[in-house]
Amino acid sequence: MVNVSIARRYARALLDVASEAGRTDAVAEQLTAFADVIAKNAELTDVLVNPAYTREQRLRVVESVMQAIPGGVEATLANTLRLLVDRNRLGYLADIARLFRDMADARAGRVRGHVTSAAPLPADALAQLQQTLQQLTQRNVLLETRVDPSLLGGVSAQVGSILYDGSIRTQLEEMRRELKQR
């Protein structure tokens, strides 16, 4: 819980500064890209969180990763990342990135959702599903799609903390439970 509260403070401060500059979405994309690069490379992660490495070494790694991000990074994000190095808080980077994105979405009236289907959905079906979910939630819904053949058919959508499950697998499981009770 302490880790999340520390990450939340950094995420909120970065969001406030990025919002004032009108660069919230750009910072969100860059922060996510930076965190993804670090998360996907165990050696980079080790350098950034291992106390055996000096601050200067960590700062050089952070600067190198910032330069490797296409288009560079916003000054506010660069300063925040340097601050995380100075305060030995780089271990919270993944949480900061997630919380920043969630807070930015909340401020913009957006919510992220995940749609899972047995086969890839056609664009028109996905657009119709997105519109239906927006009507249900009264918010702008950003959907990510996944394919899971084990669903057998139908669609499962999670928006925020709410799960809308219309998959055939779930319907079969419910029928099995009902039959066992009789």
Curated annotation (Swiss-Prot):
GO molecular function: proton-transporting ATP synthase activity, rotational mechanism
Superkingdom classification of source: Bacteria
Main location class: membrane
InterPro entries assigned to the protein according to its UniProt record, in alphabetical order: ATP_synth_OSCP/delta_N_sf (IPR026015), ATPase_OSCP/dsu (IPR000711)
GO cellular component, one term: plasma membrane
Compartments in which it is found: Cell inner membrane
Keywords linked to the UniProt accession: ATP synthesis, Cell inner membrane, Cell membrane, CF(1), Hydrogen ion transport, Ion transport, Membrane, Transport
UniProt entry tagged with the keyword Chaperone: no
Topology versus the membrane: Peripheral membrane protein
Summary of the function given for this chain in its UniProt record: F(1)F(0) ATP synthase produces ATP from ADP in the presence of a proton or sodium gradient. F-type ATPases consist of two structural domains, F(1) containing the extramembraneous catalytic core and F(0) containing the membrane proton channel, linked together by a central stalk and a peripheral stalk. During catalysis, ATP synthesis in the catalytic domain of F(1) is coupled via a rotary mechanism of the central stalk subunits to proton translocation. This protein is part of the stalk that links CF(0) to CF(1). It either transmits conformational changes from CF(0) to CF(1) or is implicated in proton conduction.
Subunit structure: F-type ATPases have 2 components, F(1) - the catalytic core - and F(0) - the membrane proton channel. F(1) has five subunits: alpha(3), beta(3), gamma(1), delta(1), epsilon(1). F(0) has three main subunits: a(1), b(2) and c(10-14). The alpha and beta chains form an alternating ring which encloses part of the gamma chain. F(1) is attached to F(0) by a central stalk formed by the gamma and epsilon chains, while a peripheral stalk is formed by the delta and b chains.
Family: Belongs to the ATPase delta chain family.
Protein name, entry field: ATP synthase subunit delta
Taxonomic lineage: Bacteria, Pseudomonadati, Myxococcota, Myxococcia, Myxococcales
